């Protein structure tokens, strides 16, 4: 017997997008001073909706402290999602500090130094 296919193959992506939008609003209302200026980068939801990884970056503040504070507030945020989402299972939230922006800035700085060094070498020759 063939496995039953989901009636909406994009449902997981839609749920993840809705979770991201709702969490953005809920996090804005948190009063924890450890949470800096947080930007949610993306949400990955398991197929059974039991867990969701929430990737975020921090413009202002400490990323590790924000990660700890958000994971401590995960139950409160999940409860807020229960009130907003109309799905049977609201996933357990796991916040992950996304260092991609920092790494990109470091890479750009290295490239700029290499270009500056090369132009100095060309001028000297």
UniProtKB/Swiss-Prot annotation:
Biological processes annotated in GO: maturation of SSU-rRNA
Location of this chain's protein in the cell: Cytoplasm
Gene3D superfamilies xref list: 3.30.300.20
Keyword Cytoplasm: yes
Keyword Cytoplasm attached: yes
Alphabetical UniProt keywords: Cytoplasm, Ribosome biogenesis
NCBIfam families per the UniProt record, alphabetical: rbfA
Function: One of several proteins that assist in the late maturation steps of the functional core of the 30S ribosomal subunit. Associates with free 30S ribosomal subunits (but not with 30S subunits that are part of 70S ribosomes or polysomes). Required for efficient processing of 16S rRNA. May interact with the 5'-terminal helix region of 16S rRNA.
Official protein name in the record: Ribosome-binding factor A
Gene this protein is translated from: rbfA
